[in-house]
Amino acid sequence: EEETSFKLWSPTATTVQVVVYESASNDAPILKKYEMKRGNSYSYSHKDNTIGVWNLTVPESLAGRAYQYQIDFPHHQSLTRDPYTIATSPDGKRSAILSEKERQVEGFEVKNGTEATWRLENPCQAVIYEMHIRDLTKSETSGVAPELRGTFLGAAQTGTVNHFGQSTAFDYIKELGVNYVQLQPIADRHKEYDADGNVTYNWGYDPQNYNAPETSMSTNLNDPGQVIRDLKTMIQAYHDAGIGVIMDVVYNHTFSTVDAPFQTTVPDYYYRMNRDGSYQNGTGVGNETASEHEMFRKYMIDSLLYWVNEFNIDGFRFDLMGIH
């Protein structure tokens, strides 16, 4: 809590700076730029190999502020989010720095083995209900409190009924008798807005920041840690009800390549490319990630482990698994 560390793998960069902003808002001015140092220790072990890894430790807490990386390459410069960012400013535009305390929720605990009593010994016994946070809670007929509609906390609210007095949302799921819910994508995604400024409908298959929960499902968009606490609270409620939580993940493509932190940190590495420099398109959405490349495989594993160890996620559904 008394220092802030940054690491970035960008082996083709010539210089890298951490750009820290005064707050976590999208329009916050720059507070300071810090020069990062390039690692030069070679090892066959990923943990010990620092070649191409840029490091910086600032001897103070920068929690609550947004940041980006300014990266110089031989022929261009990029300003980008952290590929490993766990929290963002609204709409996922900038990475956000959080302290461990800002991620904690009273009563939330990651459990494994026999302590995870809601998990099944035999996966063939799973009865899975696929759900979308917004679909479950956004309608006025959901009975969910207006301030919680479309949010993680809304999906865990109890005592909700429709106009006929029938159970809705969380209570409805509990009455179904299922033992797992499969959440359609809850990681940060690209968003568009209508003329009234409302987020347009989206199932979530436009990934933008893989390790950060979707900010529009937070009860406080101005606090980058709130969405993490809200999601943990929701997951704990389902676990307490004896229901496991499966997460739908979309590692096969990103919404954008130009603005994606993959392309802006290691150009032309994380995506499958054609000989003419264009993107391969096996996904049908304009690009596909290169899971045959070692560092993207590592990224996927790191990301999955983060969701398990931080949020106690019980399983994953892989979108377009054939791409991998």
Q: Where are these predicted regions, by residue range?
A:
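Short proline/glycine-enriched turn/loop motifs at strand-loop junctions of beta-rich domains
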Residues: 9-16, 62, 132
